[in-house]
Protein backbone atom coordinates (compact mmCIF):
# COMPACT_ATOMS: atom_id res chain seq x y z
CA UNK A 1 0.00 0.00 0.00
CA UNK A 2 1.64 3.23 -1.16
CA UNK A 3 2.12 5.92 1.46
CA UNK A 4 0.17 9.13 0.82
CA UNK A 5 2.09 12.34 0.26
CA UNK A 6 0.98 13.66 3.64
CA UNK A 7 1.28 11.32 6.65
CA UNK A 8 -2.10 10.64 8.22
CA UNK A 9 -3.36 9.66 11.64
CA UNK A 10 -5.35 6.47 12.03
CA UNK A 11 -8.59 8.40 12.49
CA UNK A 12 -7.96 10.39 9.32
CA UNK A 13 -7.41 7.17 7.37
CA UNK A 14 -10.67 5.61 8.53
CA UNK A 15 -12.56 8.82 7.81
CA UNK A 16 -11.12 9.12 4.29
CA UNK A 17 -12.00 5.50 3.51
CA UNK A 18 -15.66 6.16 4.32
CA UNK A 19 -16.38 9.50 2.63
CA UNK A 20 -19.28 9.08 0.21
CA UNK A 21 -19.38 12.78 -0.67
CA UNK A 22 -17.26 15.71 0.49
CA UNK A 23 -19.02 18.74 1.91
CA UNK A 24 -19.13 21.85 -0.25
CA UNK A 25 -17.64 25.12 0.96
CA UNK A 26 -14.70 26.33 3.00
CA UNK A 27 -13.96 26.86 6.68
CA UNK A 28 -16.84 27.19 9.11
CA UNK A 29 -19.32 27.44 6.22
CA UNK A 30 -18.34 24.06 4.80
CA UNK A 31 -21.09 21.48 4.70
CA UNK A 32 -20.57 18.14 6.49
CA UNK A 33 -19.06 15.17 4.68
CA UNK A 34 -21.35 12.23 4.03
CA UNK A 35 -19.85 9.19 5.78
CA UNK A 36 -20.73 5.53 5.15
CA UNK A 37 -21.53 3.52 8.28
CA UNK A 38 -20.33 -0.09 8.54
CA UNK A 39 -22.12 -1.13 11.74
CA UNK A 40 -25.20 0.31 13.45
CA UNK A 41 -26.01 -0.84 16.98
CA UNK A 42 -29.51 -0.27 18.36
CA UNK A 43 -31.13 -0.48 21.80
CA UNK A 44 -34.55 0.26 23.27
CA UNK A 45 -34.08 3.82 24.54
CA UNK A 46 -33.01 5.95 21.57
CA UNK A 47 -34.63 4.01 18.71
CA UNK A 48 -38.46 4.25 19.01
CA UNK A 49 -38.81 7.70 17.44
CA UNK A 50 -36.34 6.77 14.71
CA UNK A 51 -38.46 3.80 13.65
CA UNK A 52 -41.57 5.97 13.82
CA UNK A 53 -39.89 8.37 11.40
CA UNK A 54 -39.23 5.55 8.94
CA UNK A 55 -42.81 4.41 9.24
CA UNK A 56 -44.23 7.89 8.60
CA UNK A 57 -42.04 8.31 5.51
CA UNK A 58 -42.75 4.76 4.32
CA UNK A 59 -39.03 3.98 4.23
CA UNK A 60 -37.39 0.59 4.84
CA UNK A 61 -34.15 0.05 6.75
CA UNK A 62 -31.54 0.26 4.02
CA UNK A 63 -29.08 -2.29 5.44
CA UNK A 64 -30.72 -4.46 8.10
CA UNK A 65 -27.76 -6.83 7.72
CA UNK A 66 -25.49 -4.09 9.13
CA UNK A 67 -27.85 -3.34 12.02
CA UNK A 68 -28.11 -5.30 15.26
CA UNK A 69 -30.26 -4.63 18.32
CA UNK A 70 -30.29 -5.70 21.95
CA UNK A 71 -32.15 -4.88 25.15
CA UNK A 72 -29.91 -3.42 27.83
CA UNK A 73 -30.69 -0.04 29.43
CA UNK A 74 -34.13 -0.75 30.91
CA UNK A 75 -33.95 -4.46 31.58
CA UNK A 76 -34.09 -5.86 35.12
CA UNK A 77 -31.19 -8.02 36.26
CA UNK A 78 -33.36 -10.35 38.35
CA UNK A 79 -36.54 -12.26 37.48
CA UNK A 80 -36.01 -11.73 33.76
CA UNK A 81 -38.60 -14.41 33.03
CA UNK A 82 -41.31 -12.15 34.48
CA UNK A 83 -42.91 -9.06 32.88
CA UNK A 84 -40.98 -5.82 33.38
CA UNK A 85 -42.68 -4.01 36.26
CA UNK A 86 -42.05 -0.41 35.22
CA UNK A 87 -44.57 0.51 32.49
CA UNK A 88 -42.24 2.91 30.65
CA UNK A 89 -39.40 0.41 30.56
CA UNK A 90 -41.75 -2.38 29.51
CA UNK A 91 -43.16 -0.24 26.69
CA UNK A 92 -39.70 0.63 25.37
CA UNK A 93 -38.60 -3.01 25.31
CA UNK A 94 -41.84 -4.19 23.69
CA UNK A 95 -41.60 -1.39 21.13
CA UNK A 96 -38.07 -2.42 20.18
CA UNK A 97 -39.24 -5.99 19.65
CA UNK A 98 -42.09 -4.89 17.39
CA UNK A 99 -39.85 -2.53 15.41
CA UNK A 100 -37.16 -5.15 14.86
CA UNK A 101 -39.73 -7.69 13.72
CA UNK A 102 -41.35 -5.20 11.33
CA UNK A 103 -38.11 -3.91 9.80
CA UNK A 104 -36.22 -7.21 9.71
CA UNK A 105 -33.51 -6.35 12.24
CA UNK A 106 -31.68 -8.99 14.24
CA UNK A 107 -32.50 -8.66 17.95
CA UNK A 108 -31.01 -10.27 21.05
CA UNK A 109 -33.78 -9.94 23.70
CA UNK A 110 -33.70 -10.70 27.41
CA UNK A 111 -32.91 -14.35 28.00
CA UNK A 112 -31.13 -14.76 24.66
CA UNK A 113 -27.66 -16.29 24.92
CA UNK A 114 -26.15 -13.25 23.18
CA UNK A 115 -28.15 -10.53 24.97
CA UNK A 116 -26.22 -7.90 26.85
CA UNK A 117 -24.99 -4.35 26.87
CA UNK A 118 -24.73 -3.19 23.28
CA UNK A 119 -21.06 -2.19 23.58
CA UNK A 120 -20.12 -5.59 24.96
CA UNK A 121 -21.99 -7.83 22.54
CA UNK A 122 -20.61 -6.08 19.43
CA UNK A 123 -16.98 -6.94 20.19
CA UNK A 124 -17.69 -10.38 21.65
CA UNK A 125 -19.52 -11.40 18.47
CA UNK A 126 -16.70 -10.11 16.27
CA UNK A 127 -19.00 -7.52 14.71
CA UNK A 128 -16.67 -4.68 15.68
CA UNK A 129 -13.55 -4.77 13.51
CA UNK A 130 -10.59 -2.49 12.76
CA UNK A 131 -11.13 0.27 10.23
CA UNK A 132 -14.91 0.27 10.58
CA UNK A 133 -17.25 3.15 11.22
CA UNK A 134 -19.59 2.24 14.08
CA UNK A 135 -22.51 4.26 15.44
CA UNK A 136 -25.17 3.79 18.09
CA UNK A 137 -27.67 6.02 19.83
CA UNK A 138 -25.52 5.90 22.95
CA UNK A 139 -22.64 8.12 24.00
CA UNK A 140 -20.35 5.24 24.97
CA UNK A 141 -20.16 3.89 21.43
CA UNK A 142 -16.55 5.11 21.62
CA UNK A 143 -15.84 1.75 23.31
CA UNK A 144 -15.49 0.13 19.88
CA UNK A 145 -12.57 2.42 19.04
CA UNK A 146 -10.38 0.01 21.01
CA UNK A 147 -10.30 -2.06 17.80
CA UNK A 148 -9.14 0.80 15.59
CA UNK A 149 -12.71 1.59 14.57
CA UNK A 150 -14.09 5.12 14.34
CA UNK A 151 -17.03 4.75 16.70
CA UNK A 152 -19.39 7.52 17.77
CA UNK A 153 -22.58 8.04 19.70
CA UNK A 154 -25.42 9.68 17.77
CA UNK A 155 -28.83 11.21 18.50
CA UNK A 156 -32.25 9.82 17.65
CA UNK A 157 -32.64 11.85 14.43
CA UNK A 158 -29.25 10.54 13.32
CA UNK A 159 -30.32 6.99 14.19
CA UNK A 160 -33.19 7.44 11.75
CA UNK A 161 -30.83 8.81 9.08
CA UNK A 162 -28.53 5.79 9.38
CA UNK A 163 -31.44 3.34 9.34
CA UNK A 164 -32.75 4.97 6.16
CA UNK A 165 -29.49 5.58 4.27
CA UNK A 166 -26.60 3.74 6.00
CA UNK A 167 -24.80 7.10 5.92
CA UNK A 168 -24.40 10.07 8.23
CA UNK A 169 -23.47 13.71 7.56
CA UNK A 170 -20.52 14.53 9.84
CA UNK A 171 -18.05 17.36 10.16
CA UNK A 172 -14.32 16.56 10.22
CA UNK A 173 -12.75 16.45 13.68
CA UNK A 174 -9.51 17.47 15.27
CA UNK A 175 -7.06 14.84 16.47
CA UNK A 176 -5.46 14.32 19.87
CA UNK A 177 -2.78 11.86 20.93
CA UNK A 178 -2.76 10.69 24.55
CA UNK A 179 0.63 9.06 25.05
CA UNK A 180 1.01 6.78 28.08
CA UNK A 181 4.52 5.36 28.19
CA UNK A 182 6.34 3.24 30.72
CA UNK A 183 5.36 0.29 32.88
CA UNK A 184 2.21 0.39 34.99
CA UNK A 185 2.82 -0.25 38.70
CA UNK A 186 1.20 -3.36 40.20
CA UNK A 187 -2.48 -2.80 40.95
CA UNK A 188 -2.92 -0.03 38.39
CA UNK A 189 -5.46 -0.74 35.66
CA UNK A 190 -6.90 0.72 32.49
CA UNK A 191 -9.65 2.38 34.55
CA UNK A 192 -7.02 4.20 36.58
CA UNK A 193 -5.34 5.38 33.38
CA UNK A 194 -8.48 6.91 31.91
CA UNK A 195 -9.57 8.50 35.19
CA UNK A 196 -6.11 10.07 35.44
CA UNK A 197 -6.33 11.29 31.83
CA UNK A 198 -9.71 12.93 32.44
CA UNK A 199 -8.49 14.54 35.66
CA UNK A 200 -5.52 15.93 33.72
CA UNK A 201 -7.27 17.36 30.66
CA UNK A 202 -10.73 17.94 32.14
CA UNK A 203 -14.17 16.91 30.96
CA UNK A 204 -13.92 19.36 28.07
CA UNK A 205 -10.29 18.75 27.17
CA UNK A 206 -11.10 16.47 24.26
CA UNK A 207 -13.98 18.50 22.85
CA UNK A 208 -14.12 18.28 19.06
CA UNK A 209 -11.32 15.70 18.97
CA UNK A 210 -10.90 12.04 18.25
CA UNK A 211 -8.38 10.76 20.78
CA UNK A 212 -5.81 8.15 19.82
CA UNK A 213 -4.35 6.38 22.86
CA UNK A 214 -0.71 5.49 22.25
CA UNK A 215 2.44 4.42 24.02
CA UNK A 216 3.90 1.30 25.59
CA UNK A 217 1.47 1.24 28.52
CA UNK A 218 -1.51 1.26 26.16
CA UNK A 219 0.04 -1.42 23.96
CA UNK A 220 0.50 -3.64 27.03
CA UNK A 221 -3.23 -3.63 27.79
CA UNK A 222 -5.65 -6.41 26.91
CA UNK A 223 -8.57 -5.66 24.61
CA UNK A 224 -10.79 -5.42 27.68
CA UNK A 225 -8.52 -2.74 29.10
CA UNK A 226 -8.42 -0.84 25.83
CA UNK A 227 -12.21 -0.92 25.65
CA UNK A 228 -12.40 0.55 29.15
CA UNK A 229 -10.19 3.45 28.10
CA UNK A 230 -11.96 4.18 24.81
CA UNK A 231 -15.33 3.85 26.56
CA UNK A 232 -14.64 6.90 28.74
CA UNK A 233 -13.26 9.13 25.97
CA UNK A 234 -16.66 10.82 26.02
CA UNK A 235 -16.15 11.77 29.66
CA UNK A 236 -13.15 13.80 28.45
CA UNK A 237 -15.42 15.57 25.97
CA UNK A 238 -14.04 13.73 22.93
CA UNK A 239 -16.02 12.67 19.87
CA UNK A 240 -14.39 9.24 19.92
CA UNK A 241 -11.36 7.31 21.16
CA UNK A 242 -9.16 4.84 19.29
CA UNK A 243 -6.29 2.39 19.79
CA UNK A 244 -4.29 1.08 16.84
CA UNK A 245 -4.99 -2.58 16.06
CA UNK A 246 -2.14 -5.01 16.70
CA UNK A 247 -1.58 -8.69 17.44
CA UNK A 248 -3.57 -8.36 20.68
CA UNK A 249 -6.53 -7.11 18.64
CA UNK A 250 -6.24 -9.85 16.05
CA UNK A 251 -6.04 -12.64 18.64
CA UNK A 252 -9.14 -11.30 20.36
CA UNK A 253 -11.07 -11.33 17.08
CA UNK A 254 -9.78 -14.64 15.71
CA UNK A 255 -12.53 -17.26 15.61
CA UNK A 256 -15.37 -15.00 16.74
CA UNK A 257 -18.73 -15.57 15.02
CA UNK A 258 -18.53 -12.61 12.61
CA UNK A 259 -14.76 -12.43 12.15
CA UNK A 260 -13.34 -13.26 8.70
CA UNK A 261 -11.98 -16.77 8.14
CA UNK A 262 -9.42 -18.45 5.91
CA UNK A 263 -7.94 -16.30 3.16
CA UNK A 264 -10.34 -13.50 4.08
CA UNK A 265 -8.85 -13.42 7.57
CA UNK A 266 -5.30 -13.16 6.23
CA UNK A 267 -6.29 -10.35 3.87
CA UNK A 268 -8.15 -8.53 6.63
CA UNK A 269 -5.20 -8.66 9.03
CA UNK A 270 -2.88 -7.34 6.34
CA UNK A 271 -5.24 -4.42 5.70
CA UNK A 272 -5.76 -3.78 9.42
CA UNK A 273 -2.02 -3.44 9.97
CA UNK A 274 -2.00 -0.48 7.57
CA UNK A 275 -4.36 1.51 9.78
CA UNK A 276 -1.66 2.62 12.22
CA UNK A 277 -0.86 6.32 12.25
CA UNK A 278 1.87 7.08 9.71
CA UNK A 279 5.31 8.13 10.96
CA UNK A 280 5.45 11.89 10.91
CA UNK A 281 1.68 12.40 11.11
CA UNK A 282 0.78 15.39 13.24
CA UNK A 283 -1.93 15.59 15.88
CA UNK A 284 -3.67 18.83 16.73
CA UNK A 285 -3.02 18.19 20.42
CA UNK A 286 -0.71 15.86 22.34
CA UNK A 287 -0.86 14.81 26.00
CA UNK A 288 1.76 12.76 27.85
CA UNK A 289 1.48 10.63 30.99
CA UNK A 290 4.18 8.59 32.70
CA UNK A 291 2.66 5.20 33.47
CA UNK A 292 5.11 4.60 36.33
CA UNK A 293 3.68 7.60 38.20
CA UNK A 294 0.07 6.36 38.08
CA UNK A 295 -1.75 4.76 40.99
CA UNK A 296 -5.31 3.61 41.77
CA UNK A 297 -7.63 6.54 41.06
CA UNK A 298 -11.07 7.50 42.40
CA UNK A 299 -13.50 10.35 41.86
CA UNK A 300 -14.67 12.58 44.71
CA UNK A 301 -17.13 14.87 42.90
CA UNK A 302 -19.97 14.89 40.41
CA UNK A 303 -18.11 14.74 37.12
CA UNK A 304 -15.45 12.24 36.00
CA UNK A 305 -12.76 14.93 35.95
CA UNK A 306 -13.09 15.46 39.69
CA UNK A 307 -10.74 12.67 40.67
CA UNK A 308 -7.61 12.08 42.73
CA UNK A 309 -5.35 9.14 43.54
CA UNK A 310 -6.84 6.84 46.17
CA UNK A 311 -3.91 7.80 48.37
CA UNK A 312 -5.01 11.44 48.22
CA UNK A 313 -7.70 13.52 49.88
CA UNK A 314 -10.80 15.47 48.98
CA UNK A 315 -9.47 18.76 47.57
CA UNK A 316 -10.11 22.15 49.15
CA UNK A 317 -12.15 24.34 46.78
CA UNK A 318 -10.53 27.43 48.30
CA UNK A 319 -7.25 26.37 46.69
CA UNK A 320 -8.76 26.23 43.19
CA UNK A 321 -7.84 29.37 41.25
CA UNK A 322 -10.46 29.23 38.49
CA UNK A 323 -13.72 30.64 39.86
CA UNK A 324 -15.94 28.39 37.77
CA UNK A 325 -14.06 25.27 38.83
CA UNK A 326 -14.08 26.41 42.46
CA UNK A 327 -17.84 26.89 42.44
CA UNK A 328 -18.32 23.52 40.73
CA UNK A 329 -16.16 21.86 43.41
CA UNK A 330 -18.11 23.51 46.23
CA UNK A 331 -21.40 22.38 44.71
CA UNK A 332 -20.05 18.85 44.20
CA UNK A 333 -18.87 18.53 47.80
CA UNK A 334 -22.25 19.67 49.07
CA UNK A 335 -24.03 17.07 46.95
CA UNK A 336 -21.53 14.34 47.81
CA UNK A 337 -21.63 15.12 51.54
CA UNK A 338 -17.84 15.33 51.78
CA UNK A 339 -15.47 17.65 53.64
CA UNK A 340 -12.31 19.05 52.09
CA UNK A 341 -9.22 17.30 53.38
CA UNK A 342 -10.94 13.97 54.05
CA UNK A 343 -8.67 11.08 53.09
CA UNK A 344 -10.25 9.13 50.24
CA UNK A 345 -9.53 5.89 52.08
CA UNK A 346 -11.73 7.15 54.95
CA UNK A 347 -14.80 7.56 52.73
CA UNK A 348 -17.34 4.89 53.68
CA UNK A 349 -19.79 3.50 51.13
CA UNK A 350 -23.15 1.74 51.30
CA UNK A 351 -23.09 0.02 47.92
CA UNK A 352 -20.57 -1.42 45.46
CA UNK A 353 -21.50 -1.89 41.80
CA UNK A 354 -19.41 -3.99 39.42
CA UNK A 355 -20.57 -3.92 35.82
CA UNK A 356 -21.47 -1.57 32.92
CA UNK A 357 -20.04 -1.21 29.42
CA UNK A 358 -16.91 0.17 31.09
CA UNK A 359 -16.08 -2.77 33.35
CA UNK A 360 -18.58 -5.60 32.86
CA UNK A 361 -16.36 -7.99 30.89
CA UNK A 362 -14.94 -11.36 31.91
CA UNK A 363 -11.50 -9.92 32.70
CA UNK A 364 -13.11 -7.41 35.07
CA UNK A 365 -15.05 -10.15 36.84
CA UNK A 366 -11.90 -12.25 37.22
CA UNK A 367 -10.15 -9.32 38.91
CA UNK A 368 -13.05 -8.92 41.33
CA UNK A 369 -13.14 -12.65 42.05
CA UNK A 370 -9.40 -12.70 42.79
CA UNK A 371 -9.91 -10.04 45.45
CA UNK A 372 -13.05 -11.60 46.96
CA UNK A 373 -11.78 -15.18 47.04
CA UNK A 374 -11.70 -16.26 50.68
CA UNK A 375 -13.07 -12.93 51.89
CA UNK A 376 -16.47 -11.48 52.82
CA UNK A 377 -18.26 -8.30 51.87
CA UNK A 378 -18.32 -6.01 54.91
CA UNK A 379 -21.43 -5.91 57.08
CA UNK A 380 -23.95 -3.38 55.86
CA UNK A 381 -22.51 -3.22 52.34
CA UNK A 382 -24.61 -4.23 49.36
CA UNK A 383 -22.54 -5.47 46.42
CA UNK A 384 -23.99 -6.08 42.95
CA UNK A 385 -21.95 -7.96 40.36
CA UNK A 386 -23.64 -7.61 36.98
CA UNK A 387 -22.11 -9.26 33.88
CA UNK A 388 -22.16 -7.15 30.75
CA UNK A 389 -23.66 -9.92 28.65
CA UNK A 390 -25.17 -13.36 28.94
CA UNK A 391 -22.06 -14.75 27.28
CA UNK A 392 -19.90 -13.14 29.97
CA UNK A 393 -22.25 -14.54 32.61
CA UNK A 394 -21.97 -18.05 31.19
CA UNK A 395 -18.18 -17.80 31.01
CA UNK A 396 -17.98 -16.57 34.60
CA UNK A 397 -20.15 -19.43 35.80
CA UNK A 398 -18.08 -21.96 33.86
CA UNK A 399 -15.02 -20.68 35.76
CA UNK A 400 -16.81 -20.78 39.13
CA UNK A 401 -16.63 -17.03 39.62
CA UNK A 402 -20.30 -16.82 40.53
CA UNK A 403 -19.70 -19.05 43.55
CA UNK A 404 -16.90 -16.75 44.72
CA UNK A 405 -19.19 -13.72 44.46
CA UNK A 406 -22.10 -15.42 46.21
CA UNK A 407 -19.93 -16.95 48.95
CA UNK A 408 -18.48 -13.50 49.63
CA UNK A 409 -21.97 -12.07 50.09
CA UNK A 410 -22.37 -10.29 46.75
CA UNK A 411 -25.45 -10.45 44.52
CA UNK A 412 -24.85 -12.22 41.18
CA UNK A 413 -27.17 -10.79 38.55
CA UNK A 414 -28.35 -11.23 34.96
CA UNK A 415 -26.88 -9.11 32.15
CA UNK A 416 -27.78 -5.46 31.62
CA UNK A 417 -26.77 -1.86 32.19
CA UNK A 418 -28.06 -2.15 35.75
CA UNK A 419 -26.90 0.45 38.27
CA UNK A 420 -24.85 2.42 35.76
CA UNK A 421 -27.92 4.60 35.24
CA UNK A 422 -31.30 5.11 36.86
CA UNK A 423 -33.41 3.56 34.09
CA UNK A 424 -34.09 0.19 35.70
CA UNK A 425 -34.79 -1.24 39.18
CA UNK A 426 -31.10 -1.26 40.22
CA UNK A 427 -30.82 2.20 41.79
CA UNK A 428 -29.41 3.97 44.82
CA UNK A 429 -31.68 5.57 47.38
CA UNK A 430 -31.20 9.26 48.24
CA UNK A 431 -27.99 9.78 50.19
CA UNK A 432 -26.57 6.33 49.51
CA UNK A 433 -22.92 6.25 48.46
CA UNK A 434 -21.63 3.82 45.83
CA UNK A 435 -18.22 2.72 44.62
CA UNK A 436 -18.98 2.01 40.98
CA UNK A 437 -17.03 0.60 38.04
CA UNK A 438 -19.28 2.54 35.64
CA UNK A 439 -18.43 5.71 33.72
CA UNK A 440 -20.46 8.62 35.10
CA UNK A 441 -20.82 10.13 38.56
CA UNK A 442 -23.29 12.89 37.72
CA UNK A 443 -25.89 13.97 40.28
CA UNK A 444 -28.66 11.38 40.32
CA UNK A 445 -26.98 9.17 37.72
CA UNK A 446 -27.48 6.00 39.79
CA UNK A 447 -30.73 7.13 41.35
CA UNK A 448 -32.13 10.37 42.74
CA UNK A 449 -29.82 11.70 45.45
CA UNK A 450 -27.33 8.85 44.98
CA UNK A 451 -23.61 9.57 45.39
CA UNK A 452 -21.18 7.88 43.02
CA UNK A 453 -17.42 7.31 43.20
CA UNK A 454 -15.93 5.93 39.97
CA UNK A 455 -13.37 3.20 40.61
CA UNK A 456 -11.64 0.23 38.99
CA UNK A 457 -12.86 -3.35 39.49
CA UNK A 458 -10.00 -4.05 41.90
CA UNK A 459 -10.79 -0.99 44.00
CA UNK A 460 -14.49 -1.85 43.92
CA UNK A 461 -13.85 -5.34 45.28
CA UNK A 462 -11.47 -4.14 48.00
CA UNK A 463 -13.94 -1.42 48.96
CA UNK A 464 -16.68 -4.01 49.37
CA UNK A 465 -14.48 -5.94 51.80
CA UNK A 466 -13.33 -2.96 53.91
CA UNK A 467 -16.41 -0.79 53.61
CA UNK A 468 -14.36 2.28 52.71
CA UNK A 469 -12.65 3.23 49.45
CA UNK A 470 -9.70 0.85 49.30
CA UNK A 471 -7.31 -1.02 47.05
CA UNK A 472 -6.41 -4.72 47.33
CA UNK A 473 -3.10 -3.64 48.91
CA UNK A 474 -5.11 -2.38 51.90
CA UNK A 475 -6.54 -5.83 52.66
CA UNK A 476 -5.17 -8.35 55.10
CA UNK A 477 -3.88 -11.55 53.59
CA UNK A 478 -6.36 -14.40 53.28
CA UNK A 479 -5.48 -17.11 55.84
CA UNK A 480 -4.04 -20.27 54.31
CA UNK A 481 -6.45 -23.18 54.28
From Swiss-Prot:
Biased composition (Polar residues): 429-441
Pathway(s) per entry: Amino-acid biosynthesis; L-leucine biosynthesis; L-leucine from 3-methyl-2-oxobutanoate: step 2/4
Coiled coil spans: none
Binding site for [4Fe-4S] cluster: 357, 417, 420
Cofactor(s) required, per the database record: [4Fe-4S] cluster
Keyword Nuclease among record annotations: no
InterPro entries: 3-IsopropMal_deHydase_lsu, Acnase/IPM_dHydase_lsu_aba_1/3, Acoase/IPM_deHydtase_lsu_aba, Aconitase_4Fe-4S_BS, Aconitase_4Fe-4S_dom, IPM_dehydratase_rel_enz, IPMI_cat
Documented EC number(s): 4.2.1.33
CDD domains membership: IPMI
Gene Ontology terms for molecular function: 3-isopropylmalate dehydratase activity; 4 iron, 4 sulfur cluster binding; metal ion binding
GO biological process: L-leucine biosynthetic process
Short name of any one Pfam family annotated for the protein: Aconitase
Binding note for cofactor: Binds 1 [4Fe-4S] cluster per subunit.
Reactions it catalyzes: (2R,3S)-3-isopropylmalate = (2S)-2-isopropylmalate
Function text: Catalyzes the isomerization between 2-isopropylmalate and 3-isopropylmalate, via the formation of 2-isopropylmaleate.
Family: Belongs to the aconitase/IPM isomerase family. LeuC type 1 subfamily.
PANTHER family (UniProt xref): 3-ISOPROPYLMALATE DEHYDRATASE (PTHR43822:SF9), HOMOACONITASE, MITOCHONDRIAL-RELATED (PTHR43822)
Subunit description: Heterodimer of LeuC and LeuD.
Entry protein name: 3-isopropylmalate dehydratase large subunit
Organism encoding this protein: Mycobacterium sp. (strain KMS)
Taxon lineage: Bacteria, Bacillati, Actinomycetota, Actinomycetes, Mycobacteriales
Gene, per the UniProt record: leuC
